Each structure stands twice: as structure tokens, then as C-alpha cells.
């Protein structure tokens, strides 16, 4: 499998870091600019986008969460909603074989399907990268 440096998948960890101006936010900002210019393709599964929403909802309330939903939907990102049998088998294999959340398994499977680098700072993905299942663009040291 060949992973392209012109294709990236956003994990919720990366988007939340960007929204909260945490470590790595500058990298996300640069990637969003490149996607806006059409130099790269940027993807995110709706399951992971839902993770962003519920995280903001839990921490900051529904009004801000709704505003973030509208804001992120305008990012230069291709939002995916694939729930096909083949894709779900890929998701469940990641979840069954690695100590990651179910939502993280969607990000990993999307990365494989799109042959794209996964953008995250979540150390749970280290095992998948170590085993050569995905390639990661780390937004911070893990």
C-alpha cells in the first residue's frame, strides 16, 4: 500500500487541538491552507467529526458545539460517511486488533482507504504506525 503525502485524514484529536489552539494547531492551520489552495486532499469521516462535536458539547455546551459544527463543515475537507460492509470490516479489524477506540478505528480505516497520512497527536495510533498499518503525521511529540 502506498500512502500519498498529497492526501491526509484528520482525526478528531487534530481538529480539537486546532480549535483549542493547542500544541500542533499551527500544523493544522498550514494543512488547511494547503487544502484550500487545492494542493492536497483532506478527508475526515463523519464519525470522527461527531467526536469533535460531542467533545465541544461536553466541555463548552450546545451553543458553542453547534457553532463549531457549522465552522468545521466549511473547512476544505471531504467529509465521508462510508458505512459499507467492506469499510466496516476494516474498521472492526482495527478495533479488534489494537487498543484504540471505535472512532479511532474509523480514522485508521479512512486513512487506509484513501491511502492518506493520518493527522493526529493521539498516542493510541503509535501501535498501528509501528506495525505499518497506517502512516501518521504527528502534530506533537508522543
Where are the regions a protein language model picked out?
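Short, well-structured N-terminal submotif of metal-dependent ribonuclease cores
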Residues: 1-44, 57-70, 142
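Acidic, PIN/NYN-like endoribonuclease modules and their adjacent C-terminal/linker elements
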Residues: 1-7, 80, 112-142
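Active-site neighborhoods of divalent-metal-dependent phosphate/nucleic-acid chemistry enzymes
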Residues: 3, 78-117, 121
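A generic structural signal for short hydrophobic patches within well-formed alpha-helices
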Residues: 15-16, 49, 125-126
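Structured helix-beta-strand junction loops
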Residues: 37-39, 74-75, 114, 131
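Active-site-proximal, substrate-binding regions of enzyme catalytic domains
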Residues: 47-83, 88
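Short, hinge-like loop/turn segments at secondary-structure boundaries
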Residues: 59-62, 98, 135-139
Amino acid at each position: 500500500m502506498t500512502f500519498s503525502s498529497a492526501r491526509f485524514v484528520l482525526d478528531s484529536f487534530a481538529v480539537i487541538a486546532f480549535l483549542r489552539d493547542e500544541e500542533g494547531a499551527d500544523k493544522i492551520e498550514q494543512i488547511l491552507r494547503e487544502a484550500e489552495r487545492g494542493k492536497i486532499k483532506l478527508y475526515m469521516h463523519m464519525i470522527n467529526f461527531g467526536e469533535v462535536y460531542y467533545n465541544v458539547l461536553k466541555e463548552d455546551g450546545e451553543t458553542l458545539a453547534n457553532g463549531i459544527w457549522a465552522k468545521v463543515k466549511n473547512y476544505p475537507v471531504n467529509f465521508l460517511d462510508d458505512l459499507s460492509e467492506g469499510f466496516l470490516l476494516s474498521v472492526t479489524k482495527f478495533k479488534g486488533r489494537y487498543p484504540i477506540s471505535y472512532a479511532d478505528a474509523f480514522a485508521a480505516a479512512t486513512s487506509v482507504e484513501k491511502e492518506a497520512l493520518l493527522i493526529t497527536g493521539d498516542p493510541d495510533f503509535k501501535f498501528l504506525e509501528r506495525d505499518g498499518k497506517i502512516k501518521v503525521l504527528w502534530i506533537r511529540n508522543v
